[in-house]
């Protein structure tokens, strides 16, 4: 049991490090609220962050298997992002976290 907990802790640590990066949860929240494919500019506008930060976080989410990136051969280039099945599986946990944050915001106002 201890070995299993140790293995799980390593994976949890990895997830927490990734999710604690600037704007990572914001991007997941925005994409969670609107399951339709989203373009980079729409995510950037809704998250209100720099292009560099959004691009890095989307690349990290894609590398972690939480976001799909689909590029179209258009001029100018069109790229759409969607949540993967793994990210959708995280939705209940993220919803609980976001609900907790909103409830705390109501209490501290």
Q: Where is each model-derived feature located?
A:
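N-terminal intrinsically disordered/low-complexity leader segments
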Residues: 1-7
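Amphipathic alpha-helical dimerization/coiled-coil segments
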Residues: 7-12, 29, 89-109
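N-terminal helix-turn-helix DNA-binding core of bacterial DNA-binding proteins
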Residues: 10-53, 74, 80
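Basic amphipathic alpha-helical segments that dock to polyanions
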Residues: 54, 58-62
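Glycine-centered, phosphate/nucleic-acid-interacting loop/turn motifs that mediate DNA/RNA or nucleotide
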Residues: 65
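Short beta-strand "wing" residues that participate in macromolecule-binding interfaces
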Residues: 69
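Basic, amphipathic "hinge/linker" alpha-helix immediately C-terminal to the N-terminal HTH DNA-binding motif
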Residues: 73-94
């Amino acid at each position: 049991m201890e070995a299993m907990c140790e293995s799980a802790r390593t994976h949890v640590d990895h997830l927490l490090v990734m999710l604690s990066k600037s704007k990572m949860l914001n991007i997941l929240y925005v994409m969670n609220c609107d399951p339709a494919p989203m373009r980079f500019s729409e995510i950037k506008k809704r998250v209100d962050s720099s292009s560099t930060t959004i691009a890095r976080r989307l690349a990290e989410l894609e590398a972690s298997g939480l976001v799909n990136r689909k590029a179209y051969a258009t001029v100018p280039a069109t790229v759409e992002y969607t949540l993967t099945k793994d990210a959708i599986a995280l939705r209940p946990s993220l919803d609980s976290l976001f609900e907790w944050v909103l409830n705390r915001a109501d209490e501290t106002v």
